[in-house]
Amino acid sequence: MTLNLCVLTPNRIVWDSKVKEIILSTNSGQIGILPNHAPIATAVDIGILRIRLNDQWLTMALMGGFARIGNNEITVLVNDAEKGSDIEPQEAQQTLEIAEANLRKAEGKRQIIEANLALRRARTRVEAINVTS
């Protein structure tokens, strides 16, 4: 039995195919979704989406949004998403270093909040490359 997974951003469809299982980062922690999962709607946190196709696991960096699960259909609507295999490791590492430097230099609540958010996004992209299952 499989699930139909569709990952959408405002500009494109990132993923639309059948999967065996996913592990999704939500605002209340990670949840595993298998076929015949109970229907839910949940907020998606900045984090890694793990996708199992047969015996292979793939990763995707998600930048926050919402997910709806029901009737073996999973729809994930996010601000942005990148497949781990599409992320350039050197560029992701440079972005992480810049985000860390910007956080150290941040002054005032707004700059600190924005710098923390950029750092979380950068860490998620690096993690999507480095995750092995």
Swiss-Prot record:
* Alphabetized SUPFAM superfamilies for the sequence: Epsilon subunit of F1F0-ATP synthase N-terminal domain (SSF51344)
Annotated InterPro entries: ATP_synth_F1_dsu/esu (IPR001469), ATP_synth_F1_dsu/esu_N (IPR020546), ATP_synth_F1_esu_C (IPR020547), ATPsynth_dsu/esu_N (IPR036771)
Query: What UniProt keywords are attached to this protein's entry?
Result: ATP synthesis, CF(1), Chloroplast, Hydrogen ion transport, Ion transport, Membrane, Plastid, Thylakoid, Transport
Q: Where in the cell is it found?
A: Plastid, Chloroplast thylakoid membrane
Q: What is any one of the record's Gene Ontology cellular component terms?
A: proton-transporting ATP synthase complex
User: Which processes are annotated in GO (biological process)?
Assistant: proton motive force-driven ATP synthesis
Q: How does it assemble?
A: F-type ATPases have 2 components, CF(1) - the catalytic core - and CF(0) - the membrane proton channel. CF(1) has five subunits: alpha(3), beta(3), gamma(1), delta(1), epsilon(1). CF(0) has three main subunits: a, b and c.
What is this protein called in UniProt?
ATP synthase epsilon chain, chloroplastic
Give the organism the record lists. Answer: Vitis vinifera
Q: Gene of origin?
A: atpE
